[in-house]
């Protein structure tokens, strides 16, 4: 396996990262792993576990690529999807979470089944499994494979397989608790490295004023005219709520950390913490794309904006750290999806099939 951008120091940082990650996973696995303790972490998650876990599930590699690409092509307007999400995250905290936790369910199909019958539960269980397989696992593994392939000279399927094995290791080892605890460590690392990338980029451009002069003026507009082909303001205001309620309030992969909260208060605090973390999406993920346009206007593929910034601005050692961060985002998203998938399959399909035998 040949690494295109990695030096000895980069490899050392990568190895150290995985050793720490494995230690956290083993520690979390020392807890009981039966029934709800495996899938819902024994209802022991505190607000910071919930907040970082939800944000980590959302901040996958596809989002990193897409956010930097959007910043490169259109500026901060795509940040509406991050900042507007606060409304629906609050909706989860104050409307949905009390009902979910009050009913003491393990999955959202189970919650709907209690209200509307077993047929509804069965339909939603299979729908949830298909959704996780396609929109979470397949797309995340593909995006992760693209990123890993840029660094290692290995086929796409091998990249995806490696990521799947690493994520499955933590999910099977300690269940949701292992995923949640490693998410705290991984997301703090992601914030620090992404902030360093933005700061170094601004310095290379020559400061904030130089950056604003180097890109089109409308790159700093949060709303664009309704005849804009990329981001008209009306669909953002009226269309996003439909997707926002589904994604933040009813998607099993996103909501599962809330179901595992130690109490309703912890669940609500953690959910609100996620909303505050979403504010960071613009400076950490979209801004590097804008900086990339200022530094590398000749770049043909906007999807390469993030890795272009990394490989051109960071010294030896930092590239390995960034790769560790990208792996962190991958492991976080895939691990959460695998845990949600196994929870729904076990609780809503397998267990019920045994009852009816």
How would you name each of these model-derived features?
Residues 20, 63, 88-95, 104-105, ...:
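Membrane-embedded alpha-helical core segments of multi-pass
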Residues 24-31, 134-137, 141, 145-162, ...:
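Hydrophobic alpha-helical segments and their helix-loop junctions in multi-pass secondary transporters
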Residues 67-173, 257-355:
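Helix-loop-helix junctions that connect adjacent transmembrane helices in secondary transporters/permeases
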Residues 1-64, 171-174, 187, 193:
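Membrane-interface "cap" regions at the ends of multi-pass membrane proteins
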Residues 22-25, 238-254, 327-336:
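Transmembrane alpha-helical segments in integral membrane proteins
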Residues 9-18, 82-89, 231-240:
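Alpha-helical transmembrane segments
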């Amino acid at each position: 396996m040949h690494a295109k951008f990695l030096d000895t120091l980069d490899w050392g940082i990568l190895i150290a990262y995985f050793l720490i990650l494995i230690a956290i996973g083993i520690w979390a696995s020392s807890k009981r792993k039966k029934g709800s303790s495996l899938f819902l972490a024994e209802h022991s998650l505190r607000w910071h576990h919930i907040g970082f876990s939800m944000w980590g599930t959302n901040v996958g590699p596809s989002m990193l690529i897409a956010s930097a690409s959007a910043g490169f092509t259109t500026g901060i307007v795509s940040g509406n999807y991050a900042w507007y999400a606060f409304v629906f995250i609050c909706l989860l905290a104050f409307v949905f979470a009390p009902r979910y936790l009050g009913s003491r369910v393990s999955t959202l199909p189970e919650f709907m089944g209690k209200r509307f019958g077993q047929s509804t539960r069965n339909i939603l269980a299979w729908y949830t499994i298909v959704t996780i397989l396609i929109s979470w696992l397949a797309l995340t593994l593909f995006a992760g494979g693209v990123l890993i392939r840029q660094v290692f000279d290995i086929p796409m399927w091998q990249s995806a397989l490696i990521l799947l094995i690493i994520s499955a290791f933590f999910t099977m080892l300690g269940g949701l608790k292992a995923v949640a605890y490693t998410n705290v460590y991984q997301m703090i690392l992601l914030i620090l490295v992404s902030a360093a990338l933005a700061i170094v980029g601004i310095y290379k451009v020559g400061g904030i004023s130089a950056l604003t002069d180097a890109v089109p003026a409308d790159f700093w507009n949060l709303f664009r005219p309704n005849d804009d082909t990329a981001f008209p303001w009306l669909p953002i205001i009226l269309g996003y709520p439909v997707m926002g309620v589904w994604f933040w309030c009813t998607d099993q992969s996103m909501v599962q950390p809330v179901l595992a909260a130690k109490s309703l208060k912890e669940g609500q605090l953690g959910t609100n913490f996620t909303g505050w973390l979403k504010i960071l999406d613009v400076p950490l993920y979209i801004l590097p794309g804008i900086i990339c346009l200022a530094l590398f206007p000749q770049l043909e593929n906007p999807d390469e904006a993030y890795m272009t910034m990394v490989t051109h601005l960071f010294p030896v050692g930092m590239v390995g750290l960034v790769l560790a961060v990208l792996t962190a985002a991958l492991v976080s998203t895939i691990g959460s999806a695998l845990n949600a998938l196994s929870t729904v399959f076990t609780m809503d399909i397998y267990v019920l099939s045994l009852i009816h035998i």
